[in-house]
Amino acid sequence: MESDLEFSNIVSVLKLVEATTQRTVMAKALSSLLAKTPPQVIDKVIYFLLGSLRPDWEGVELGLAERLTLRAISMATGLPIRQVEELYKKLGDAGEVAKRAAEIKRSKGGGGTIFDFIDTGPKRRLTISKVYDTLMAIAKASGEGAQDTKVKLLSSLLTDAEPDEAKYITRFVIGRLRLGVADMTILDALSDAFDVNRDLLEKAYHVYPDLGKIAKTLAEGGEEAVKAIKVTPGVPIQPMLAERLSSPKEILNKLGGVAICEFKYDGERMQIHKLKDGTVKIFSRRMEDITNQYPDVAEYAREAIDAEEFIVEGEGVAIDPDTGEFKPFQELMHRKRKHNIKEAIEEYPINLYLFDVMYVNGQDLTDLPLPDRKKVLFSIIKPHEHVHHADWIITDDADSLEKFFLDAISSGCEGVMCKSVKLGSVYEMGARGWLWIKYKRDYKSELSDTMDLVVVGAFWGRGKRAGTYGALLLAAYDPDSDQFYTVCKVGSGFTDEDLKKLPQMLEPYKIPHRHPRVVSKMEPDIWFTPGLVLEITGAEITMSPLHTCCSVMLKGDVGLAIRFPRFTGRYRTDKRPEDATTVKEIFEMYSNQKKVKLTDQVP
């Protein structure tokens, strides 16, 4: 047992995490669990806690729908499928159904399944290896009869499980573990459990975002082994992020007087990798493998980039085939389909606009200044109809920057991205800093920019909205505390179609109480694990006693809130909750807003 861990240890922690609203309690429980986990299986423990068999970018899916999961519960417990389905209607949670069915089986001294009539000796306690390996076998089952194989494998696992174990295994299978244990929380727990510098772990995570691998490397090889983790083609790196300002003069001052400025296209950010064997992979901003959605872009990159191995970054933009004009981001949603991709390619063609290079032919370029990376990028791009360098200028003049910005807007772009050219202008993986600054005005709103906020709660509607959500509680992210602070309650901007699909979209995130990473004074009717990100605009940012955003910075019992918030119609499925607008950004927007008001009052 020394090289394995009884699954009951994990279940004890899961129960505690699910019940608590205190982040410190959750962190301590996770740290204690990882400290006693054998190195051989620490990766499996972490994957289970995160609700995924492998990192998201590997795209491993179990492929078991809820209906088939209920069948497996029926097989494992001997309860008729009709009774299991009735339990599901009553409880509304397949995990609770599995637990209740196991309890019924136990109370009857066995459920009459085939496993009850075979003398297998004393019942063996489940280990994480048994659970994980069986789940991986379910994911790998393919071909004729795969669904039956998956159901039988899950059934055999549930047969060996205690009621609470069955509950969490089932929730894992249907993708509703509902713990909200985030990557940053795991990094905190690893740092505490192994008494190592958290920054070291986070740096490795930015280079190689696989917490299972990082944990196993740390447990088996120590800090030096973690330091040896390098940028690897085929493994996405955490994208660099930008701050925001709303005037050319401020931007140039912040960047030291001169900047490279590029069009900020209204498309999908893409990190494109080519491996030595010729394989091309495309990763989204969320580091998910989206190659299958964009096989044309993969081929364009293979043709246009003159390097055996590379990692480049750019924006995939929908193009009108008749006029060559840019089309809005929403057009790319048609590329999300799993079928008829050929038709989608013809109907919604794409151009690729490259703006950075991070790796070429065995060389990690992330520590080079931006001008040096640009030289490399220009040297490897061959002329191609569908692949171009992003439109750009280098300037030290605010008027020139403003003119370039207006050119970008008139071309259908969101604005411009301004970047430092100084010696320290490295590619900061996973960091949001002042080396890159967004200049992006929303002319339809009094706010200088939109915000991407995370849904953490919902309020039931009244009147026409009775029976669905009337408003959502939204929060901004604080990377320093790894918590979400509420900033508005939004009910405007939603179409009838939005109101119809939101409950379904949010169902996987529903939890019985406030999540420990959410800081809120308001009490919505329904709480959610931070997950879904929405784009929001509004009139202005004001002080509010009802919200917690920036309350630490304001040093009082008030926070900041968005006045007259409105949903823009854009679901930011390309962003993780940790990629949402930060509390620091909102505070800066509030400060800039006050400066503008003061300026307007000057005669």
UniProtKB/Swiss-Prot annotation:
The entry's keywords: ATP-binding, Cell cycle, Cell division, DNA damage, DNA recombination, DNA repair, DNA replication, Ligase, Magnesium, Metal-binding, Nucleotide-binding
Classification via Pfam families: DNA_ligase_A_C, DNA_ligase_A_M, DNA_ligase_A_N
Active site: K264 (n6-amp-lysine intermediate)
Reaction(s) this enzyme catalyzes, per UniProt: ATP + (deoxyribonucleotide)n-3'-hydroxyl + 5'-phospho-(deoxyribonucleotide)m = (deoxyribonucleotide)n+m + AMP + diphosphate
Example GO biological process: DNA recombination
Keyword ATP-binding: yes
Enzyme nomenclature, EC number: 6.5.1.1
Domain of life the protein comes from: Archaea
Molecular function GO terms recorded: ATP binding; DNA binding; DNA ligase (ATP) activity; metal ion binding
Positions that bind ATP: E262, R269, R285, E315, F355, R432, K438
Cofactor field: Mg(2+)
Biological role: DNA ligase that seals nicks in double-stranded DNA during DNA replication, DNA recombination and DNA repair.
Annotated family: Belongs to the ATP-dependent DNA ligase family.
Protein name: DNA ligase
Organism for this UniProt entry: Caldivirga maquilingensis (strain ATCC 700844 / DSM 13496 / JCM 10307 / IC-167)
Lineage of the organism: Archaea, Thermoproteota, Thermoprotei, Thermoproteales, Thermoproteaceae
UniProt gene name: lig
